[in-house]
């Protein structure tokens, strides 16, 4: 399967509220892109990249733009999977605010040619900086608890951008030490960092000791509203 500039594979499209980050609570249209270049051990959307996970649908840019244009929400959220595998700059329409959730391993303004497993290849041109700089980017760089390797070149790119915030998901207090080292290494301001708690149950999100530690270190706490309200239900 060859995925190029004019092909978009989508796992699901739905309306809900943004659950995390600097726009938590806003009414949004979510477009969840299929495929990811990572395989994080605790991923809560494995159906977007696990080969036997089920169906996805192919769209053209014009088909997705029509859905976006006719949707009720003002906020449009590209999530995944990994949206940056695709030409997101070709999906904009007037009168909407676009958000992207990325794993921080791919630079959007460079051309990519990535082999994904044995059957899938991503080949897209560089995105237009003028367009993507109008997006609200949520850069979710992975910690060691994901068992994934950092792409330092990509992180250095994101550290220079003014149009993004950083989101981390932690399991324990030791993860905060790793975040501290990360932001010092790449020169990231604490006020741009939002930290949430790993897990897909209500109980996993109500851990006062961890929340106290997050705010005592000067970070923003990011509640994961979708987990608190609906657990791990799809389409939420």
Feature map (PLM): residue ranges:
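Conserved Radical SAM active-site core
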Residues: 3-15, 27-133
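A short beta-strand-turn-helix
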Residues: 16-21
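A generic structural micro-feature
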Residues: 23-25
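Conserved AdoMet/S-adenosylmethionine-binding subsite of the radical SAM
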Residues: 84-236
């Amino acid at each position: 399967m060859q995925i190029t500039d004019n092909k978009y594979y989508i796992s699901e499209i739905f309306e809900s509220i943004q659950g995390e980050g600097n726009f938590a609570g806003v009414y949004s249209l979510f477009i969840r892109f299929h495929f990811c270049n990572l395989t994080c051990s605790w991923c809560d959307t494995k159906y977007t990249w696990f080969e036997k996970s089920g169906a996805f649908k192919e769209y053209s840019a014009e088909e997705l733009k029509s859905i976006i244009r006719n949707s009720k929400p003002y906020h449009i959220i590209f999530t995944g999977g990994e949206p940056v595998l695709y030409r997101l700059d070709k999906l904009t329409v007037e009168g909407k605010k676009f958000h992207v959730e990325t794993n921080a391993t791919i630079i959007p303004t460079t051309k990519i040619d990535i082999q994904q497993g044995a059957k899938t290849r991503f080949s897209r041109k560089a995105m237009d900086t003028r367009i993507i700089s109008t997006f609200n980017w949520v850069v979710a760089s992975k910690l060691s608890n994901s068992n994934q390797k950092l792409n330092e070149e990509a992180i250095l790119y994101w550290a220079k951008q003014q149009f993004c915030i950083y989101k981390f998901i932690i399991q324990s207090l030791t993860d905060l030490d790793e975040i501290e080292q990360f932001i010092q290494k790449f020169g990231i301001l604490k006020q741009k960092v939002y930290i949430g708690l790993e897990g897909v149950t209500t109980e996993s999100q109500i851990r006062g000791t961890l929340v106290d530690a997050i705010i005592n270190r000067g970070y923003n706490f990011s509640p994961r509203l979708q987990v608190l309200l609906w657990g791990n239900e799809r389409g939420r």
